[in-house]
Each structure stands twice: as structure tokens, then as C-alpha cells.
């Protein structure tokens, strides 16, 4: 099962496949479609950190 992570602000239209990375745990989506949704949502929120 390939997991996709939300794209970064630089490239919203793209969602990357998640590789093994112990450093940071980003939001991971099980399907590319979900990742795309995540991308769009993130682009809207922009920099809104708690």
C-alpha cells in the first residue's frame, strides 16, 4: 500500500508518495485522491499554525 503525503506549499497540484522517513511524520493519505484533497485544503489554509 503506497501512502501519499500532502504536498508542500510550493507545488500544490502534486502529491508525493511517502517514502520511509523517520524524521518528520506528515499527514499521510492512503490514496492519491485524498492527498490531492489535502493539498487543496492546505493551500487554502496557508500558514495557520496553532
From Swiss-Prot:
Keywords: Chromosome, Developmental protein, Differentiation, Disulfide bond, DNA condensation, DNA-binding, Nucleosome core, Nucleus, Spermatogenesis
Subunit description: Cross-linked by interchain disulfide bonds around the DNA-helix.
Tissues where this protein is expressed: Testis.
UniProt GO cellular component terms: nucleosome; nucleus
Disulfide bonds: none
Protein name in UniProt: Sperm protamine P1
Family: Belongs to the protamine P1 family.
Origin species: Pan paniscus
Superkingdom, natural source: Eukaryota
Subcellular location(s) per record: Nucleus; Chromosome
Main location: nucleus
Job of this protein: Protamines substitute for histones in the chromatin of sperm during the haploid phase of spermatogenesis. They compact sperm DNA into a highly condensed, stable and inactive complex.
InterPro entries attached to this UniProt entry: Protamine_P1 (IPR000221)
Gene Ontology terms for molecular function: DNA binding
Gene Ontology BP, a term: sperm DNA condensation
Signal peptide: none
